């Protein structure tokens, strides 16, 4: 094999030298950043992380450097917050200073600061407020949000009955239900689960969800300026993001032809009405680009996350038949087997509510929230974090806190019950993060999880294909997400 030519070798040395200089400069001029392991040129602290179990690596580093420490991803510093006290202090007590959105280049480069998730400043405040109010106001003379979710729960149960108590993988069916709810919210339409248009949309969302954890995406997020010129699967990811956006824009065109501002049918109608109201404001953030990206954000955040939580939840109930039996008993006693569950039943179902909370705590679907960033030079404890620095609130460190949740590695609904069997709230329940940047769809997700979960358990007994004690429930840690291991089960009608 030939040695590298002198020009190539010189270029390589130059790149490494510049990278080392960049890291050194940031460390010298970075205010008083929290302590952390010494980064290497180009790769930063990647070698200190087990990419197959990043949460374990972050907890290990916290033991060495404390609850606030600095890691370098590539050449860029990131402040990690470990534990409830520091996360609360940053996101609640100093929330306005930590309100920025940290980098996630693979999505950021496609959405370019539009939509809800990756926008900043006044645009973010405006679009978030509009989206929250629109979701809240569903039902003003129309079908309420709860009615839309209940309708989908009935359709989901009909599909599950078609399995005829035979072994099946629930992944696809459970993903269809929350995706259809988003379709109903955005453009007042739901699809049969075998509809070709719907299947194409599901394919785009599903592939991107799983590819977020791939080595290609991780490399892009570390070195976006280089990776954008290199062929690879990261380009397929961006194309699929564009596919979801184009799907929404087609629906927008249909709505523009039949829009009645006095009688909005859905989210798209409400947004189009705002565009019309502000058509003379050339700087208005109510435009088609923000509409398309807001819709994409709702699909991305509201489909796979909810379905994965449901899928993991069913697996845990198959693993723990004694818990499933208590849920069945409570549902039969409070609701019966024929009346559709509704949100007003939640207060009367403390054990079921505790099980749902424990599922979300135990699986820690998102070990870390999406990255934040400080919007100004920020004094935090004994440190000064420079403006624009990324911040990772490490949610797993809260959800698995040993003082708040004794034996946190054990699945135990008792974590959310008091001595009288009543539901027990805790500030440490943070699967949707904390503060003003918490998940905009939290209310919808909580509603979906409750109504889908109770409707399924009302109608079916969940049966394992092996002895429950032999079931593997260890999360598959893939980087950004904790996913359930693949499994099949039987649903036996009750």
From Swiss-Prot:
Keywords: Acetylation, Endoplasmic reticulum, Fatty acid metabolism, Heme, Iron, Lipid metabolism, Membrane, Metal-binding, Microsome, Monooxygenase, Oxidoreductase, Phosphoprotein, Signal. The modification N6-acetyllysine is found at residues 253, 379. One of its GO terms (cellular component) is endoplasmic reticulum membrane. Pathway: Lipid metabolism; arachidonate metabolism. Heme binds at residue 439. The keyword Membrane applies. Highly expressed in liver, particularly in hepatocytes and bile duct epithelial cells (at protein level). Expressed in nephron segments. Prominent expression is detected in proximal tubules at the corticomedullary junction (at protein level). Also expressed in renal cortical collecting duct. Lower expression levels are detected in adrenal glands. Belongs to the cytochrome P450 family. This is Cytochrome P450 2C44. The lineage of its organism: Eukaryota, Metazoa, Chordata, Craniata, Vertebrata.
